[in-house]
A protein has these predicted regions:
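Acidic-aromatic substrate-binding/catalytic surfaces of carbohydrate-active enzymes
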Residues: 49, 55, 59, 609-676, ...
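Extended, loop-rich substrate-binding clefts of extracytoplasmic carbohydrate-active enzymes
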Residues: 257, 611-613, 658-715, 805-815
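Catalytic domains of carbohydrate-active enzymes that cleave complex glycans
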Residues: 416, 443-605, 825-836, 840-841, ...
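Beta-strand-rich recognition/accessory modules
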Residues: 604-617, 624-626, 634-643, 694-696, ...
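Acidic (Asp/Glu-rich), glycine- and aromatic
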Residues: 631-633, 710-754
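Short carbohydrate-recognition loop motifs
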Residues: 689-690, 877-897
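Extracellular carbohydrate recognition and processing domains
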Residues: 941-976
């Protein structure tokens, strides 16, 4: 904030007739009476009219005296509070330089027997009134629901002479509660998202707000006839998760026309966003890339495009600015190109560490950001910041960034920034300390060099009352952990973060217990304390639950572990507080709070079960777990013939039983989806239920599960339909895990094939192999002499491609799987599959062989064992004749997510044995510059990397498989292999993985 020094003001004031030093104070009110009137101009702006009303109202609440409000038509009275630049003020020798105040600045000054509060007509006078009430009379507006309006019998003001002009022209604390109009106005936040109307001074107005390229040139309108308007990627024009061709003259022309139309349609808007889409894939055409090469950054085509639009509207719309982003691949500034004076560049901090101040931290991305803000300051006169202040994966999660809020805002202001958007938990109430964070940010945005600890303590005292000391200790507890251990913190922080160590949570709970006791007699304050506690309760609920080493079971119509009473009580308290607060979301864009409730309820009470039953058979289905069948009971033998998995199995309880996925991987789309279930119309004639789910990728899965009324026969009829408007590439895979007794004792039989024991080779601990299309016919039979039972399986389906079988040396499960071909499925078309399972006797079962000892010299995972993140968007499976099994997984080179992962089972390895991990990988290569990909192994239990590295594009050959060595270590539980592209899509459009394998180290 620009503070005009008091001594200078005092000298000016003495010269022009303001109250002399030592003059008696102004008594605005005394015992419910006042000699003052509030005077405003007869032509006052809407915000000045509102300011007069607010001043009158709050003075009455404070003192009991209701001051009259008058226009400035008559003579000056004996004692006036003069608001705004009115006729009465103009009769005084006030010495106030109105020109320096702008739209939002103000001066509060005693001039003779009068109090003057004057500022910009738009918002300045109103801000002056609120600042007077706050700084002189002690009013506070902590949140939309909590304020402090002190009571005073006598109001005296003396020596007041203060001018404030904000450094930042745009100030937005983007939190859910901060959208309230009164809160925003009273805390001087001119947020574009707040519900600010004209009487509250309006706001900074954007249209549209961000990521607008496809608003500007909609693909639905243009792509079919003009694909050249969109990104050229790998020689093909695309509008799928891409950008515009910004050097195409027609795109420039259409962009100018669209912006002019937006200005006509929205005459009050002062900022038009022309900004990249929220994805990668900038255009690779020669013209766009020539600018990139000349300026050394992908920001060059964007800025060149934006400059042309800005030039076109500069004369006709001089009050409108064009806003764009320096974000992700466009964050680095150009070498020489300058932004036009009517261009705003919004620099985004998304990659930075948010637990250490940007100005001083040595984290690489923070250092890089410092370079970028200095660079953009040399190329742009009007720079804004898009900053991030919470975990967007977990709005409820403790996010100790209090050490950086004020220092970062001051750092921005010191580097010429003129507007700041502080993105927080904007979608729901109840997020972690969001009211406090919004309040503190509002104060820092108005005065970047404010005493932030004083602001925090003031809020804590006013908001939490007697619990304030404990709340202060709680905040310091987390900050000290982050600071002392130098823990970096990012915007997708999760419940396993190292600052949420067990000892920290134990102490936090002790502090909250003490805080709740301190305000036990104040229900509203107690609720606020309990809302603040939601964060550590959320961590406990997500990390805890019933004993993880207890297998799930079906009891009382639900499937889950034995209940944990303490966990259930915690969940009950958590949801009671959250429901009272109105929490609706805990993760940006979803899942919503009801998803969390279902997940926590499932942990504490289990998942609902649908049961089908006849005299011979009982089938147990869990719709919430991908429609998984966890029970196939032979009632005569009281034996469950499916293996539903067990604690320790990767993904448990989302593994085992009968499952389906629309992917090469059984961890793909649909595998863990929450299905809805309804009974069939056949009723008792054929007991059954229909499971269905709409997946976000435009696919629908439907499954009819039914049993014969009398015989032990289960039928599963599945259909995967493409409900999207365009073709979708997918496959339908099913897997039935059967429990046939001790490992390696099951007999496998098929028509025209001699029965054989299905065993694992001695040098391995797992065998997975295809038995079809070579399979000579159906049904396939698995027989168990140990259990005295057999299972007969028949599979039919459209495009049925392969049938496979898998067995392990360390668990009884024997898997039978069927997959369709991977193909483009037209809109409205579908893939189908039908599996029939009949229970039989064990006739023909072979006797078990001798006990076998298994080594694990090599442990291999083909791509069908991978998990793909955002499959179909950032990663996918492809048929590749050069891959070892004809398939590979690939990930988009313009991204940086760990989108290919293999969560391996530690039982596949010999205990306490070192292995070297390798990956068969290749790239599509367009150039030698930069990295090709990163790789590593992550230990989730210890929240630490095990090994890792990267490969450079220059060291790899286009479309040639190469072996990458990851490292040598002892594989353990809760570890996974990952690969990630290096956000270098121009040079490496795709990264491929054929397989991973471990070799026993010498």
């Amino acid at each position: 904030m620009k503070h005009i020094p008091f001594l200078v003001l005092a000298a000016i004031s003495a010269a022009v007739g303001s109250a002399p030093a030592g003059a008696a104070p102004l008594v605005l009110a005394d015992r419910g009476r006042s000699d003052f009137v509030i005077v405003r101009s007869a032509a006052a702006s809407p915000s000045e009219v509102h300011a007069a009303d607010e001043l009158q109202s709050f003075l009455e609440q404070i003192s009991g005296a209701k001051l009259p409000i008058r226009a400035d038509a008559g003579p000056v009275g004996a004692h006036e509070i003069m608001l705004g630049n009115n006729a009465h003020l103009q009769t005084l020798q006030h010495g106030i330089n109105l020109d320096v105040l702008g739209d939002e600045g103000f001066t509060m000054r005693i001039v003779g027997p009068h109090l003057v509060i004057v500022g910009g007509r738009l918002r300045g006078t109103m801000y002056g009134v609120y600042t007077f009430l706050e700084e002189q009379l002690g009013c506070r507006w902590y949140s939309s629901k909590v304020s402090r309006i002190p009571k005073r019998e006598r109001i005296e003001i003396e020596g007041l002479d203060d001018t404030q002009v904000p450094v930042l022209e745009y100030r937005e604390p983007f939190e859910f509660d901060s959208f309230d109009a009164d809160w925003a106005a009273r805390n001087k936040a001119n947020s574009q998202s707040a519900r600010l109307d004209e009487q509250r001074g309006g706001k900074v107005t954007y249209f549209p707000f961000v990521h607008t390229f496809y608003n500007l040139i909609p693909p639905d309108e243009f792509f079919a006839t003009h694909p050249e308007y969109y990104s050229l990627i790998n020689g093909q024009r695309t509008c799928d998760a891409a950008q515009l061709c910004l050097t195409n003259p027609d795109v420039v022309r259409l962009g100018i026309e669209r912006v002019r139309q937006w200005i006509r349609d929205h005459p009050d808007v002062r900022i038009i966003s022309v900004s990249q889409n929220d994805c990668g894939n900038p255009c690779q055409c020669p013209n766009c890339q020539a600018l990139v090469q000349a300026e050394g950054t992908e920001a060059a085509p964007v800025l060149n495009f934006v400059n042309q639009i800005a030039d076109a509207i500069a004369d006709e719309s001089p009050n409108v600015a064009i806003d764009t982003l320096a974000y992700s691949y466009t964050r680095h500034p150009p070498r020489t190109m300058q932004a036009r004076p009517n261009v705003i560049v919004r620099l985004c901090t998304i990659e930075c560490c948010f637990s250490h101040p940007l100005a001083t931290d040595d984290y690489a991305q923070n250092v890089s950001f410092r370079d970028d803000i200095v660079g953009w300051g040399q190329h742009c006169r009007r720079m804004y910041i898009w900053d991030y202040v919470c975990s967007f994966a977990n709005y409820l999660l403790p996010f100790p960034n209090w050490d950086v809020l004020q220092p970062n805002i001051e750092f921005f202001a010191n580097n010429g920034v003129r507007g700041i958007f502080e993105e927080g938990a904007y979608q729901s109430p109840g997020s972690e300390l969001e009211e406090m964070r919004a309040y503190v940010m509002a104060k820092c945005l108005w005065q970047p060099d404010c005493d932030v600890k004083a602001v925090e303590d003031d809020f804590l005292q006013g908001y939490y009352g007697a619990a304030a000391p404990m709340m202060r200790d709680y905040i310091d507890l987390l900050e000290n952990k982050v600071r002392d251990d130098h823990i970096h913190m990012f915007i997708w922080a999760g419940v396993g973060e190292p600052y949420l160590a067990d000892e920290v949570l134990t102490e936090a709970n002790r502090l909250f217990d003490e805080a709740e006791r301190a305000v036990a007699g104040e229900p509203d304050v107690l609720h606020r304390v309990k809302v603040a506690r939601l964060g550590i309760q959320y961590v406990a609920l997500q990390r805890g639950g019933p004993a993880q080493d207890e297998p799930y079971r079906v009891a009382d119509g639900r499937y889950g572990p034995p209940p944990d009473d303490a966990y259930t009580r915690l969940a009950t308290d958590f949801f009671a507080t959250a429901d009272r607060e109105g929490v609706t979301l805990f993760h940006e864009g979803g899942p919503n709070f009801e998803d969390l409730r279902r997940a926590i309820t499932a942990k504490s009470a289990g998942h609902p079960v649908v049961t089908l039953e006849n005299p011979r058979l009982r089938v147990e289905i869990v719709p919430d777990l991908g429609g998984r069948i966890v029970g196939l009971w032979d009632k005569e033998r009281n034996a469950n013939l499916v293996d539903p998995g067990a604690p320790g199995d990767p993904g448990y309880p989302n593994c085992g039983g009968y499952q389906e996925a629309l992917s090469r991987s059984l961890r793909g789309p649909g595998a863990t989806a929450e299905y809805t279930a309804r009974p069939t119309n056949e009723g008792a004639d054929r007991p059954g239920c229909v499971l269905s789910v709409e997946l976000p990728n435009g696919l629908r899965l439907e499954r009819l599960v039914s049993i014969d009324p009398q015989e032990p026969v289960l039928t599963i009829e599945s259909a995967a339909t493409n409900t999207a408007a365009e073709p979708r590439r997918f496959m339908l895979q099913s897997d039935l895990a059967l429990n046939m007794g001790a490992p390696e004792t099951a007999t496998f039989a098929a028509p025209n094939m001699p029965p054989e024991l299905f065993v694992v080779p001695p040098e391995q601990r797992q065998v997975a192999e295809w038995v079809a299309p070579e399979l000579p016919g159906w049904p396939v039979r698995l027989l168990s002499r140990e259990r005295g039972v057999g299972v007969e399986v028949t599979v039919e389906g459209s495009d049925l491609y392969r049938v496979g079988r898998t067995a392990y040396s360390f668990q009884p499960a024997v898997h039978l799987g069927a997959v369709s071909a991977l193909r483009e499925v037209p809109a409205g078309d579908r893939l189908t599959q039908k599996m029939t399972v009949r229970l039989t006797d064990a006739a023909g079962a072979l006797p078990p062989g001798p006990a076998r000892q298994h080594q694990a010299d090599v442990v291999e995972a083909q791509d069908d064992q991978f998990s793909l993140y955002r499959e179909g968007e950032l990663s996918e499976f492809v048929q590749d004749p050069t891959a070892s099994d004809g398939f590979a997984a690939r990930q988009l080179g313009s991204d940086i997510e760990w989108s290919i992962q293999w969560n391996y089972d530690p039982r596949l390895f010999e205990p306490d044995t070192r292995y070297t991990l390798y990956g068969a990988m290749k790239i599509d290569k367009q150039g030698d510059a930069g990295k090709a990909f990163d790789f590593g192994v992550y230990d989730s239990a210890n929240a630490a990397g095990v090994c890792g590295g990267s490969r450079n594009a220059a060291d790899l050959t286009d479309d040639q498989w190469t072996t990458t060595e990851f490292g040598t270590f002892v594989p353990g539980p809760q570890q996974y292999v990952w690969t990630a592209p290096a956000r270098n899509g121009d040079n490496v459009p795709w990264v491929y993985v054929d397989r991973f394998w471990f070799e026993k180290a010498e």
